[in-house]
Amino acid sequence: MRYVTAGESHGPEEIAVIEGIPAGLHISQEDVNEQLARRQRGYGRGERQKIETDTVTFLTGVRHQTTLGSPITLNVHNDDHNNWSKIMAPNEPATAENTLRKVLRPRPGHADLVGGMKYRHREDLRNVLERSSARETTMRVAVGAVAKKLLSEIGVDVHGFVVNVGPAKSDLNELTKYKNLQELRVVTEGFDTRALNAEADEAIKEVIDKTKRDANTVGGQVQVIATGMPVGLGSYVSADTKLDAKIANAIVGINAFKGVQFGGGFDNAEKYGDQVMDEIFWDEERGFYRGSDNLGGFEGGMTTGEAIVVRGVVKPIPTLYRPMQSVDIDTHEDHRASIERSDTTAVTAAAVIAEAMVAIELAKAVLDKFDADNIERMKEQVAVYREEIRKF
């Protein structure tokens, strides 16, 4: 399985093409639109979300809500393009009229300046920010929806939520209350902040409100949990086959993500071995299992069968309504950075995006191990493998 996305933030469309999805997978627009709506929701989002109503269209690879085995093309229309049609016109030459909203004062923390240098976009840094914008993650969530649908066929569930926004934190001890991810999902999706309880929800809202009043932005952390993965996906034989490494790459590849950990993560660095390693047990029904999950579901780059637990660190959004020091790339004079419409925080949306990226990497791993042209054949292979593992 592989995919590519295309599109600019204020261009006409966002597009994704997916290859490698087996034939016979039932997938509807509603399956994808539900995930796109989750991405748009969340406390601290900006005015752009009031303009857009993200809905997907399948252009290829799906017939009668069933995949054909051929490349799947999806697109989402950018409603805001109506306000930018001249400025983002692909088929018209540059004129004084359609270059009015040039960006010449790069924002600290954004791709503006370095991207302009790399691609020689000396005339207008908008050529950088239109693609480097997190608007592109719309299509990663859409691809993730397809991946989640495939994973659900073999009993794998994936869910993301917010750990903290600034100093306001969810109590992770709350996780022990839930028997499965569906119970957790009902709770966290019931809060605008995707927090674990009402107390954390209110505290996070207070932080976001204060940040907005201060014309500032704020970051946080999100966590993704996946359950039901077969044992032994990924491999120890080469660095580039380790599944946790692939997930780490996918998480840090999301806009604004600056760190990733698995299980106990960085806290494990302050502990001793007998406090961290997940002891091994066996019973006739379950086969081998672990007594804890401090390593986040991975050993040697391979899934252990325990829950996969991934956390990502999200920096504050670099577009500030009280802009920071910058330099005009034309005059080289000191100026405040450009202002683009933005969110106060995108941590609530980041939980959904991280969930999608984990799902994509897990789906890739499943299809690498159980390569099949049809979804039913894939499920048969998984069932045989699970039984083999159980009897080991």
UniProtKB/Swiss-Prot annotation:
PROSITE patterns noted in UniProt: CHORISMATE_SYNTHASE_2 (PS00788)
Enzyme Commission code: 4.2.3.5
Cofactor(s) needed for function: FMNH2
Record has NADP as a keyword: yes
Any GO BP annotation: chorismate biosynthetic process
Highest taxon above the source species: Bacteria
Keywords linked to the UniProt accession: Amino-acid biosynthesis, Aromatic amino acid biosynthesis, FAD, Flavoprotein, FMN, Lyase, NADP
Binding site for FMN: 131-133, 255-256, 300, 315-319, 341
A Gene Ontology term for the protein's cellular component: cytosol
Binding-site residues, NADP(+): 39, 45
Family: Belongs to the chorismate synthase family.
Subunit structure: Homotetramer.
Name of the protein: Chorismate synthase
Protein's organism: Leuconostoc mesenteroides subsp. mesenteroides (strain ATCC 8293 / DSM 20343 / BCRC 11652 / CCM 1803 / JCM 6124 / NCDO 523 / NBRC 100496 / NCIMB 8023 / NCTC 12954 / NRRL B-1118 / 37Y)
